[in-house]
Regions:
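Bacterial N-terminal signal peptides that target proteins for export
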Residues: 1-6
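Repetitive helical segments and hydrophobic/amphipathic motifs
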Residues: 11-13
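N-terminal signal peptide c-region/cleavage motif recognized by signal peptidases
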Residues: 15-17
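Transition segments tied to proteolytic processing and entry into folded domains
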Residues: 19-280
């Protein structure tokens, strides 16, 4: 494959062939919903690609590569476009950083190996894309592709759950009966759309909590389903403990109730499991 200058690199020269060990790619069976949502929820381009050629860049051409990684220029054919307004050419090029093996040797990328990539477009270069992170390429599987399609479909909807930026305020109000209460948490979002969490306690009933997207709180609503975009926004963003400023105006009794109900929400959401550290 002929090496050309890419928008991600400066003055690429002819790169050496990709020899050494086969790629030690992360097993797709271990990738979680959060892993794929980290990469794909906001990516303008999501595609299933098949490698036509790979060239390894030397240290002079890849000065920003993390220790223990090697940068490659990939030429690939587009097998399927999952997201990408305006489409893509049949063949594209991009740069990717891949981990070296335990002996420090660069990986080998097999011709016709298949991947899922999450990327942005390169201005004025129709056949080039830039990965959203230097390693935003994962081995293809039908299960991972289906999960990504679901993430993209939800993220592209007009009613998509917004990105959460913090917790604005919280309050708890006791009911008329002993043990009865209602606690609400008002979340801050990137696009200023309201999200609120409500926890209801009633004597003799199981504690219930729900999430509302909008101004109207529906007591009959429930918590988000796991492995959905709304679940991801909450489980992978909300802090494990309430920030002190959220409780600054609460009485000691209210603070105790609010903290207990916040634990109900966090326990209900469960852990945001990741196998890779999100890179921004």
């Amino acid at each position: 494959m002929k090496t050309q200058i890419l928008a991600l690199s400066v003055a690429l020269a002819t790169a050496g062939p990709a020899m050494a060990q086969p790629v030690n790619q992360q097993d797709l069976q271990t990738l979680t919903y959060a892993d794929l949502a980290d990469l794909g929820a906001g990516a303008p381009v999501v595609a299933h690609v098949r490698v036509r050629g790979a060239e390894r860049l030397n240290a002079r051409e890849a000065t920003t590569v993390r220790p223990g990684f090697t940068r490659f220029e990939i030429e690939a054919e587009v097998a399927a476009l999952i997201r990408g307004t305006g489409g893509l050419p049949e063949r594209i090029r991009y740069l990717v950083d891949l981990p070296n093996d335990s002996r420090g040797r660069p990986p080998r990328i097999a011709r016709r190996s298949e991947y899922l990539i999450m990327a942005t477009r390169v201005p004025s270069r129709a056949d080039e894309v830039r990965l959203v992170t230097a390693d935003a390429q994962v081995a293809y599987s039908a299960a991972a592709a289906d999960m990504l399609r679901g993430i993209v479909r939800e993220a592209s909807g007009a009613d998509a759950a917004p990105r959460i930026t913090g917790i604005g305020r919280a309050f708890s109000v006791p009911g008329n009966l002993p043990g009865e209460s209602e606690t609400q948490f008002f979340l801050q979002t990137a696009d200023q759309r309201p999200i609120s969490l409500t926890v209801l306690r009633r004597p003799g009933e199981q504690v219930r909590w729900s999430v509302a997207l909008g101004e109207i709180v529906d007591d009959s609503a429930g918590p988000p389903q796991p492995n959905t975009l709304l679940w991801y926004r909450l489980a992978c963003t909300l802090p494990a403990r309430l920030p002190a400023d959220v409780l600054s105006e609460a009485t000691p009794e209210e603070t105790q109730a609010i903290q207990a109900d916040y634990r109900v929400v966090m326990d209900g959401l469960g852990r945001c499991a990741r196998t890779r550290a999100p890179r921004r």
